[in-house]
Amino acid sequence: MLRISVRHRNAAIALGTTATAVAVGSMYADKRNVSMEKKIPTPVNIGKKTIPSRADQLLKLSKGDQYDVLVIGGGATGCGAALDAQMRGLNTALIERGDFASETSGRSTKLIWAGIRYIATGFAALLRFRNLTRPIDALSDFKGEFKMVLGAHKERRILLDNNPHLTNWVPIAVPMKTWTIWPAPMGHPLFSIMPLVLPAVFKFYDSLCGFTCPPSHLMSSSRARRKFPQLEEDVKYVSVFYEGQHNDARTATCIGLTAAEEGATVANHTEMIGTIHENGDSGKVIGIKVRDNLSGKEFDVYAKAIIFAGGPFTDGLRKMEQPDCKAAVAGAAGSHIVLPGYYAPDGMGLLDMNTSDGRFLFFLPWQGSTLVGTTDRKEDAVSSPQPPEDEIKWLLSEAEKYLSPDLKVRRSDVLSAWQGYRPLARDPHAPPG
């Protein structure tokens, strides 16, 4: 692994785990009531800063000067780490082999999701019979999930407050066709009564952010059919809750540009192709070899601390420095499709909490159309992947579950589709599989 000074190693650890929301501003969470009509505050003139051109950035990057921090990867995490480092007074550089947010950070479901599924799965795991024999461990596991969800609520609030031009609240309706569900969602009998307790669950979800989100509420079947004429007639009621929504690629790109505005050296289409060691191959890493993918020019960049922020591609970066290292990241592929806007009328999304394979499936209003996703499949990440046709067909099939029989979702309705990879931590010492 990279050997660096204690001071810079600690900085790298802290920066590598910086959340996107922290990177874009102050740790301030407003406790006022939130309405759907967000007012964008009048900008304060604090002096215009000019972002250097890419050519100027590359010229600065190739001079051979040593940076305090060098970030590899221009997604949300990498851009956030670069901005955080630069704002802490560290001389920082960032490179991205493609365009900013062109991989994972631009291929999401566009939600600032606070983790309602984690709450549900946490309760399901806590109440499983086998955990009765290990109550302390079970409570500890649930506490970890709960703390993560609380943190997600806090970061969602910060991201919404700091980026009103890129974010909004989106209402999401959960239609219920029966008063009980069997087989039970998530494989736990308790969840068979989910339709009866769902409104209370959403109120609990509201409470986790101090009720600073628009309030969850019920919608009668008659009102639901007026708002969603395409719904099946046997829907008993609809429960509505709110999540944050944002333009993921623009959010990450704006963070990267803000880092450049604050003085960081930032360059896209610039790829790491090797490492530079202090005393041959046995010495510590003091820099990397870089290629400008537009001109083909190669040069060296030196840094005291290097952060790999390649998401699902991080193992590829690690192997340049340590060829025999074991995989630490697992890729989880997810496909999305975009349908015409009439599948999400009146700016309201839909959530299926009981798909045929037990996952959550969202139907979300997005730029005048309807975004549907996501699937989940474990596989090694590849750049710019194409969504498999069988997953597109599965999404279309699931989309019909709550729709009127008169409305058929056709393959020709798909306006666009994409696939992205979520990076999941993997124990390098665990056995294969």
Spans of features found by a protein language model:
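Extreme N-terminal leader/targeting segments of oxidoreductases
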Residues: 2-69, 84-88
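Glycine-rich FAD pyrophosphate-binding loop
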Residues: 86-108
